[in-house]
Regions:
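Flexible loop/hinge segments at secondary-structure junctions
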Residues: 23-318
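Short, Lys/Arg-enriched N-terminal segments with co-localized hydrophobic residues
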Residues: 1-3
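Sec-dependent signal peptide recognition
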Residues: 5-14
Length: 318
């Protein structure tokens, strides 16, 4: 009997040892601060089911792409989140470094322009937002200088940094659309994107939660961030109406809200062979219970894809 127990102990030791040799580091995820709360939620649920919780870092979309496309070795991240589609120069960097990927559109998001509950409620146009924020604009010090119907209140706006996908989306959906045609044609879109440097607009790091915190005690300040952060802090701040449309789940999904955009997650194909659990993580992420119309991510503010788009997207990656 003692022999049997010893043999059993040796077998267990051998099994544990073989597992520790093959046990890799957890799946590593980087990228967008907007996508971060969604992927963190998925990672925690995945960890409970599969025993290994992916490590998720918020680096911003641009920073995430740099890390993700740097190479296919085990030290590089397996996954990156993006609050805009991959740019052609990033796709080239990936290709040059031997990285191929699966692109998953996980849902939709609206970019909120919001202030504290004690601040005014405004209906703003893209043109007015451009005039308030642009380096090439008239640089008004008060909102009333843009339009007499707007409050006699100093302009103070917190913006995401240039590395942020939210900033990229804001540029293409607001700054480009609000920029006067003659400036756009004579100087190009990059000039239209330039923000004032006189203190009216302040860049805040890759941290949407920090922007919200800075709004709460300041009734003249506005901030720019993703809908999920608004959804989770709705009792502390309120969004402005843009071009007459309120930001809601429905207006984002229908793209009626003028600053709506898709969100993405990219998975590194080269890692499927040697990062344990990565294939399962992809399947789990796109499952009905996570990303579907009634999925877990909807509960924390992700605007789901419409059912037909969701079905096509899942079919395309099988």
């Amino acid at each position: 009997e003692q022999n049997m127990i010893q043999r059993l102990i040796l077998t267990l030791v051998a099994v544990c040892f073989s597992f520790s040799v093959f046990a890799q580091d957890p799946i590593r995820v980087v990228g967008s601060s907007t996508v971060y709360p969604f992927t963190t939620n998925v990672a925690e649920k995945f960890g409970k089911l599969f025993g290994s919780t992916p490590i998720v870092e918020s680096t911003g979309t641009g920073g995430g792409m740099k890390l993700f496309c740097a190479g296919a070795t085990i030290e590089t991240p397996s996954v990156t989140g993006a609050s805009r589609a991959i740019k052609s120069k990033e796709a080239k960097m990936c290709a040059d470094n031997g990285v191929s990927y699966i692109e998953v559109m996980i849902g939709n998001d609206g970019i909120a322009f919001a202030n504290s509950l004690s601040g005014p409620q405004l209906n703003l146009t893209k043109k007015q937002l451009w005039l308030a924020m642009a380096e090439l604009g008239p640089k008004p010090s008060k909102w009333s200088e843009i339009d007499p119907s707007l409050p006699d209140m100093e302009i103070s706006i917190l913006s995401p940094p240039p590395t942020s996908g939210t900033r990229d989306a804001w540029n293409s959906l607001v700054m480009k659309k609000g920029c006067p045609k003659d400036i756009l044609e004579s100087q190009g879109k990059k000039k239209c994107y330039q923000l004032r440097e006189d203190g009216a607009v302040t860049e805040v790091g890759e941290n949407d939660a920090l922007i919200i915190q800075k709004l709460q005690d300041n009734e003249v300040r506005f901030g720019i961030f993703g809908f999920s952060y608004l959804d989770n802090a709705g009792d502390k701040i309120k969004p402005m109406t843009i071009e007459g449309v309120e930001i809601t789940l429905d207006t984002i999904q229908s793209y009626e809200y003028p600053i709506a955009r898709p969100l993405f997650v990219y998975f590194k194909k080269e890692h499927f062979e040697y990062v344990p659990g990565l294939k399962d993580f992809v399947k789990f992420y796109v499952s009905d219970s996570i990303m579907g119309p009634e999925g877990a991510l909807m509960d924390i503010g992700l605007v789901p894809l419409d059912p037909a788009t969701f079905k096509d997207m899942v079919a395309s990656i099988q």
